[in-house]
């Protein structure tokens, strides 16, 4: 009996888990090989010996060629003279990032060379956004060392404009969400930076517990880059009130946490205080992490926060946060004036506490209208494999472990890192893409998640080309009210489907679909039929709040 089975049996005996989950649930099928995904992640060496190598990478779904099908981008590591052992020198220059084009038939084609996006740096996170409002998604790659920014040429190729744009941040960057922080109509980018790795410090440190952790090194400040509207960006971090010289950001999340229509920043740091920067609406932010209960773990300790997932877990109209870590994880429920840690009472701690969590996801995998939890797991200091977690939200405030019922994949073990979701086969349910350390990522097709009714909302700015990043969708069907912010950068170093997915259960239509645009004007649609991708374009006559 595995650890998961033993713990689950114990939990059942002491009645911590509610009534058994119905057996007719969706399953996930590992289609990696059949889909043609063969790019293996590498940390650029033959032995895992330091934190640069062990941090891993994320993964991204995005439609780079505007054909309506989600493509895949995978950052990779490299052999680095300041990081890697000399034994790995033969890998130098041989490792690249990979772009897979979705063929629309369940398979993907490697188009990295044709698209000219095969960066050879030490890659971690990636994100895509239409920074120049020309209708196609541009690509930003976070590296250990200079970051890379590719402008989409609209013909299937990209051009490296890193230096000219001012976005070649030379620090150790992990994540980069895009949003219009100042309301001027173009997208800015927040770059989450990690720590100042010292290649000579602890170089020969090989304790049984593994290489030194993040607190052995100095932190690095993050950066907010303002889009100047001319193809260049300016660092406005200090002026915006965001400068924290000793942060150790593992990722960055943008969402509206206080329902004022402005996008805030939540920054999970590694082993120290986390930041919640509330948007003041005047181009400035203030850190209220401590006041809101977001700075530390339930015991007042700094936790090894990985990639946070955001969503309205209890359907009360306020965005909650789930943060995986090396312990039990943290489910932080938004109580308007503060956040309450409900990890233990929801059953998440019992299951997630067995593993080291990295890529956390809140998504409605079964289409019943309630957000479920997926976590990609893997040891932080060794290549020890772990099972991933899938917990179903039963709608009563409890999560039920359904992993072993959800397909053979969940009986296997990997060294998981980033994870994301998206409907890559356009069948109405959410599929998974899981990045693994020093291994091939796994593409997991959701089979049966569309048995319930669903609605996918594709939000566009005037003209219908660019995604309306930062908009909020509220879908009402009967007594169930769901909200979602259109921010595709989510979880650990990853980006997912930019469309907002809503499970409607047995409802054949949504009573209302309300869109609050980034400028806080609104559009309301009524009696919207289920089982469709609804494209909503911002009209000039949208009603102002």
Region spans (language model):
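Repeat-based blade/solenoid architectures
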Residues: 37-58, 93, 115-127, 166-177, ...
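Hydrophobic beta-strand segments that make up the repeating blades of beta-propeller
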Residues: 72-76, 134-143, 189-193, 264-269, ...
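Asp-box/WD-like beta-propeller blade repeats and closely related beta-sheet repeat scaffolds
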Residues: 111-131, 141-181, 191-215, 219-221, ...
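Beta-propeller blade termini
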Residues: 56-66, 101, 122-133, 137, ...
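Short, conserved, GDST-rich strand-edge loop motifs in beta-rich repeat architectures
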Residues: 75-92, 193-217, 374-384
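Beta-propeller blade signature
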Residues: 95-102, 220-227, 278, 388-394
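Blade-edge beta-strand/turn elements of extracellular beta-propeller
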Residues: 28-31, 107-116, 157-167, 231-243, ...
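Gly/Ser/Thr/Pro-enriched helix-cap/hinge segments flanking short amphipathic alpha-helices
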Residues: 23-27, 45, 346, 350, ...
């Amino acid at each position: 009996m595995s650890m998961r089975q033993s713990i689950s049996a114990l939990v059942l005996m002491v009645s911590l888990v509610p009534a058994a989950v119905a057996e007719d649930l969706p399953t996930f099928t590992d289609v990696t090989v059949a889909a043609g995904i063969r790019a293996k992640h590498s940390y650029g060496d033959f032995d895992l010996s330091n934190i640069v190598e062990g941090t891993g990478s994320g993964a991204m779904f995005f439609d780079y060629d505007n054909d309506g099908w989600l493509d895949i981008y995978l950052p990779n590591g490299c052999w680095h003279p300041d990081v890697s052992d000399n034994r790995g020198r033969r890998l130098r220059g041989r490792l690249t990032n990979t772009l897979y084009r979705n063929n629309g038939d369940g398979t993907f084609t490697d188009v990295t060379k044709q698209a000219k996006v095969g960066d050879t740096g030490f890659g971690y996170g990636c994100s895509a956004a239409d920074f120049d409002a020309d209708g196609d998604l541009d690509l930003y790659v976070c590296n250990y060392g200079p970051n890379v920014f590719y402008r989409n040429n609209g013909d299937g190729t990209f051009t490296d404009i890193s230096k000219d744009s001012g976005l070649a941040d030379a620090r150790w960057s992990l994540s980069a969400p895009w949003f219009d922080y100042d309301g001027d109509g173009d997208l800015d980018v927040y770059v989450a930076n990690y720590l100042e790795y010292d290649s000579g410090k602890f170089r020969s440190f090989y304790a049984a517990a593994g290489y030194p952790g993040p607190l052995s090194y100095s932190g690095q400040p993050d950066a907010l880059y303002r889009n100047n509207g001319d193809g260049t960006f300016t660092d406005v971090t200090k002026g915006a009130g965001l400068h924290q010289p000793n942060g150790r950001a593992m990722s960055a999340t943008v969402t509206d946490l206080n329902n004022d229509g402005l996008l805030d920043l939540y920054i999970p740091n590694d082993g120290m205080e986390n930041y919640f920067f509330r948007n003041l609406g005047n181009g400035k932010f203030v850190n209220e992490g401590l006041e809101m209960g977001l700075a530390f773990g339930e015991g007042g300790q700094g936790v090894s926060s990985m990639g946070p997932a955001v969503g309205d877990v209890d359907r009360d109209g306020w965005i909650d946060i789930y943060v995986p870590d090396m312990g039990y994880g943290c489910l932080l429920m938004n109580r308007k004036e503060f956040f309450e840690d409900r990890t233990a009472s929801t059953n998440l701690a019992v299951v997630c506490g067995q593993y080291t969590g990295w890529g956390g996801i809140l998504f409605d995998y079964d289409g019943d209208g309630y957000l479920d939890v997926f976590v990609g797991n893997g040891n932080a200091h060794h290549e020890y494999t772990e099972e991933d977690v899938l917990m179903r939200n039963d709608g009563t405030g409890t999560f039920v472990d359904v992993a072993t019922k959800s397909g053979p994949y969940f009986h296997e073990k990997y060294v998981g890192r980033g994870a994301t979701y998206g409907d890559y086969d356009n069948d109405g349910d959410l599929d998974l893409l899981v990045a693994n350390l020093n291994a091939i990522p796994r593409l997991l097709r959701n089979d049966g998640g569309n048995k319930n009714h669903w609605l996918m909302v594709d939000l566009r700015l005037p003209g219908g080309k660019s995604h309306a990043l930062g908009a909020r969708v509220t879908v009402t069907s009967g007594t169930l009210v769901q909200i979602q912010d259109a921010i595709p950068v989510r979880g650990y170093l990853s980006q997912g489907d930019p469309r907002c997915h809503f499970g409607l259960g047995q409802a054949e239509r949504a009573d209302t679909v309300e869109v609050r645009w980034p400028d806080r004007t609104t559009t309301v649609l009524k009696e919207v039929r289920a089982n469709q991708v609804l494209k909503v374009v911002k009209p000039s006559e949208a009603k102002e709040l």
